[in-house]
Amino acid sequence: MPTINQLVRKPRQSKITKSKSPALNKGYNSFKKSLTDVKSPQKRGVCTRVGTMTPRKPNSALRKYARVRLTNQIEVTAYIPGEGHNLQEHSVVLIRGGRVKDLAGVRYHIVRGALDTAGVNGRLQSRSKYGTKRPKEKK
């Protein structure tokens, strides 16, 4: 326990929390060609690679991912949620934060139903998370 005199000389320092999605906390000034401190909830990007990867130890699957170059020139790996997708190289996608626990280095999700990404076909529950329109009522 420090003395009051020690605290007067050097006060306690508050902990600095590190961002879990750092690519969303940078903007880009194309005139100066420099990064700026503009935070945003989502960012647009172009797919440079689309593929599958295997998850960490207890799980087994082929998880779909895309390598995306964002508008701030940062390249990130993003997860493609849902069953089936229409993404390929040069597709324009919207990225949000949120990591995938069993994929190493994947800190972002692609938003389904936005820009070039289609919603999940035949989905009836949790439709808003997968960009699926409400099905037509049968008479």
Swiss-Prot record:
It comes from the Bacteria. Residues 1-44 are annotated as: Disordered. GO terms for molecular function: rRNA binding; structural constituent of ribosome; tRNA binding. GO terms for biological process: translation. Residues 9-18 have a biased composition (Basic residues). Residues 19-39 have a biased composition (Polar residues). Gene3D superfamilies: Nucleic acid-binding proteins (2.40.50.140). The keyword Kinase does not apply. Part of the 30S ribosomal subunit. Contacts proteins S8 and S17. May interact with IF1 in the 30S initiation complex. With S4 and S5 plays an important role in translational accuracy. HAMAP family: Ribosomal_uS12_B. This is Small ribosomal subunit protein uS12. It comes from Lysinibacillus sphaericus (strain C3-41).
